[in-house]
């Protein structure tokens, strides 16, 4: 089975959707997600500064509505709605998370909690919401792994 086949099989399994650490190249994930018709968002957290930095990057990338309140509750609300991005599913690829987590551990951990809750909410509705967390080789974020 090729990597693409494995990714297509994985992305089609809504019950497994959630937040994962992955070393799979973002281009491979993107290609598989496009094949199954998902919205794809690559978000670089490398020089994001704390809570405001991650909130702003996610909001901008996912084109959150103007009413987004720029706090964790508002992030949770928008991620569990996504009506303006209706589709078969969503894939977020968060890159350079090792840098962000090292400099802003509390904000990283809270963001992962919010993303996991959003994924669980979408799983209940049978819509896949995937988050692939990426960082430098050797970094261990304590998340379930999907590796090449």
Mark where each language-model region is.
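Conserved helix-adjacent loop modules within structured domains
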Residues: 44-48, 52-88
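Generic detector of well-ordered alpha-helical segments enriched in charged/polar residues
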Residues: 8, 27-31, 55-59, 109-112, ...
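Helix-rich interaction surfaces within compact, conserved domain-sized segments
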Residues: 100-138, 142-147
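Generic detection of long, well-ordered alpha-helical segments
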Residues: 19, 23, 69, 105-108
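Mid-chain, well-packed structural core segment of small domains
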Residues: 80-107
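Conserved beta-strand segments of the P-loop GTPase G domain that flank and frequently precede/overlap
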Residues: 42-44, 93-96, 132-134
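N-terminal intrinsically disordered, cationic/polar leader segments
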Residues: 2-53, 127, 142-147
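Hydrophobic, Leu/Ile/Phe/Ala-enriched alpha-helical segments that form helix-helix packing faces
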Residues: 29, 33, 62, 79, ...
